Amino acid sequence: MMMNAFFPAMALIVLVGCSTPPPVQKAQRVKVDPLRSLNMEALCKDQAAKRYNTGEQKIDVTAFEQFQGSYEMRGYTFRKEQFVCSFDADGHFLHLSMR
């Protein structure tokens, strides 16, 4: 009777021990050139000022994110209208999305 419960328990332990852990995924981080990020910020502010018909000084850029092949800058106007500027991997402006 004890043997009937022992074998399934051992089989379960062996099978669990055979599974491989999932591989650790690491994001690639590349240091962005400060001059490039400042140029991208200025271009983003310029495009947002044109879109929202206001001055660049009334535009705040609050976040800068890097993805595999692109960059995004998030910001808002003095009226709290949110937007996202998208750039390609070389830092060229792609588009501005209103949120």
From Swiss-Prot:
GO cellular component, one term: plasma membrane
Membrane topology, as annotated: Lipid-anchor
Protein transport recorded as keyword: no
Lipid attachment points (N-palmitoyl cysteine): C18
Main location: membrane
Subcellular location(s) per record: Cell membrane
UniProt entry tagged with the keyword Membrane: yes
InterPro entries found in the cross-reference section: YsaB-like
Keywords: Cell membrane, Lipoprotein, Membrane, Palmitate, Signal
S-diacylglycerol cysteine: lipidated positions: C18
Signal peptide region: 1-17
Name of this chain's protein: Uncharacterized lipoprotein YsaB
Organism: Escherichia coli (strain UTI89 / UPEC)
